Amino acid sequence: ATFDIVNQCTFT
């Protein structure tokens, strides 16, 4: 899980 520039949690 990573947090992108717009504070959205993305699971890769």
Curated annotation (Swiss-Prot):
Q: Where is the secretion signal located?
A: none
Which Enzyme Commission numbers does its entry carry? Answer: 3.2.1.-
Describe PTMs of this protein.
Not glycosylated.
Keyword Transferase part of the UniProt annotation: no
**GO function term, MF aspect, one:** hydrolase activity, acting on glycosyl bonds
Q: Does the keyword Secreted apply?
A: no
Instruction: Write out the entry's keywords from A to Z.
Output: Allergen, Disulfide bond, Glycosidase, Hydrolase
Family designation: Belongs to the thaumatin family.
Q: What else is known?
A: On the 2D-gel the determined pI of this protein is: 4.4.
Q: How does it assemble?
A: Monomer.
Write out the function statement from the record.
Answer: Has weak beta-1,3-glucanase activity with laminarin as substrate.
The name this protein carries in UniProt is: Thaumatin-like protein 1a
Name the source organism: Manilkara zapota (Sapodilla plum)
